[in-house]
Amino acid sequence: MFDIKVLALDLDGTLTNDQKLVTPRTRAALDAAIEKGVTVVLASGRPTAGIQPLAEELGLDKKGGCILSYNGGKIVDCRTGETLVEKTLDPALVPELCAFAAAQDIAILTYNREGIVCERDKDEWANKECFTTKLPMIHVDDLASYVNYPVCKMLITLDPARRDAVCAAGQQQFAGRADLYPSSPFFIEAVPLGVAKDGSLAELLRRMGLTRETLMACGDGLNDRSMIAYAGVGVAMQNAEQPVKDCADYVTTADNNHDGVAEAVEKFILRED
């Protein structure tokens, strides 16, 4: 018998299907879990504004719950709007990250309150972030000089064939100053050193007076590995990358297009036996 109190859910490739929708069965499972007193945390690399509409669709602004955005860079209480955790990049790294992307001839973007900010606003891979977050693309001529405010992360977007080589080069250049890691075939996250979903969830659990044994985490991407390994019950989607499956306690038989999250919630939270 599992005593899950907190349910952390990655969004893209996990909670939502490939059309970025939450299916009726999954929605019903989440509603039932919330009714049992489980706190739902939407845990994503997306910016906060790119998660807010889904949180409201699920009723977390009224029922309670949290948004964990920027891969753990920020946690917001859905009901009160209070920022519980926030970690930002060293401002000196912003121009260096922009120069790194320019040298690789690839796009890099970040966010403001209105949307996604990028020099290469027509870039195919950068525009995938618009589709994912439902946020508009804002073109600027010089991203490094435009960003005069704290940012929780920057996102490098590129052809999947180049991802691993570029990521390795970035990890070498920014070692000890920022963490770079892939979050999808065409995205590389650049976040403050040590920021990851597991650390921010640990901080949230401490605030709630809970232990990691009460946490269930579901995900599919490499940026989900830390929280899946950390959670009392770590769940990988059937469509997850193999390293994610390797660190999970359970791999769903269904993928994100066939209610994989519902399968896990029904098995570990709703089942009475």
For each predicted feature, which ranges?
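Hydrophobic packing residues within well-ordered alpha-helices of enzyme cores
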Residues: 26, 51-55, 166, 170, ...
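Conserved acidic, metal-coordinating active-site core of Asp-based
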Residues: 100, 104-218, 222-226, 230
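Mg2+-dependent phosphoryl-transfer enzymes with acidic/Ser/Thr/Gly-rich catalytic loops
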Residues: 2-6, 23, 189-273
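Short active-site oxyanion
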Residues: 37-41, 63-65, 153, 213-214, ...
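Short, hinge-like loop/turn segments at secondary-structure boundaries
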Residues: 57-61, 85-86, 125-129, 197-198, ...
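Short, structured coil segments at secondary-structure junctions
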Residues: 58, 63, 71, 174-176, ...
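Active-site phosphate-binding/coordination module
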Residues: 24-125
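Asp-based phosphoryl-transfer active-site loop
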Residues: 3-19
